[in-house]
Amino acid sequence: SRHFTTVIGNEVTTTTGHFNAFPIELDSPLPNHELSDWAQLMQAMRALPGVRVITLNHPRDDHTSFTPLGPEHFNPVSGAHLGGKPYTFDALEVVTSAAMQSDIMQLYHDWFAMLNHGYRIAAIGSSDTHDVSRFILGQARTYVVCPDAAPADIDVARACENFRSMR
């Protein structure tokens, strides 16, 4: 289409969280979704051909009895990861399709705690919506500074660089 640039990505669903990795080169192998150690998982996703950005999606949702930013894994005051290892994802979803069912500002508070802790993590809008009959669609957008005079020919590498730089 002449109206947008397509980018291949993958939502990596694990027992310890949901992540998006992008861009991924066509016909790349699938990431190992059975990894539960985040350091190993981040390394495996970043090893995929073309990947420049990894996002943590819906971090307050329960994933098989694991909540990525739950009190046993995350200090919401200090922004510390209680697992001991630093966070290495590039962005945090701060508006989710389920946000209207809970404290809509909780993820913003979490994100600011991470920033205050010293992490350079971008905030993103909704990563996905699974159920159009229960959740509000299109409630958030993520904007990235990038030349866009030719929407079908966006420089994806530059857009990803600006994304990671929180621009």
Where are the predicted features?
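Extended, charged catalytic domains and RNA/DNA-binding interfaces, predominantly
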Residues: 1-167
